[in-house]
UniProtKB/Swiss-Prot annotation:
It comes from Centruroides elegans. Blocks Kv1.3/KCNA3 voltage-gated potassium channels of human T-lymphocytes (Kd=0.25 nM). Belongs to the short scorpion toxin superfamily. Potassium channel inhibitor family. Alpha-KTx 02 subfamily. Has the structural arrangement of an alpha-helix connected to a beta-sheet by disulfide bonds (CSalpha/beta). The record marks 37 as: Aromatic residue of the functional dyad. This is Potassium channel toxin alpha-KTx 2.9. Keywords: Amidation, Disulfide bond, Ion channel impairing toxin, Neurotoxin, Potassium channel impairing toxin, Secreted, Toxin, Voltage-gated potassium channel impairing toxin. The record marks 28 as: Basic residue of the functional dyad.
Length: 39
């Protein structure tokens, strides 16, 4: 799921993704936006 959070690295996405999807959520930075996924 792409969320509306700007990023330059996946680390910036980890907290917002975990806040939204819980502690097991993963995060990537794609095209300057965060992408969250559940494992």
């Amino acid at each position: 799921t792409i969320i509306n959070v700007k990023c330059t690295s996946p680390k910036q996405c980890l907290k917002p993704c975990k806040d939204l999807y819980g502690p097991h959520a993963g995060a990537k930075c794609m095209n300057g936006k965060c992408k969250c996924y559940n494992n």
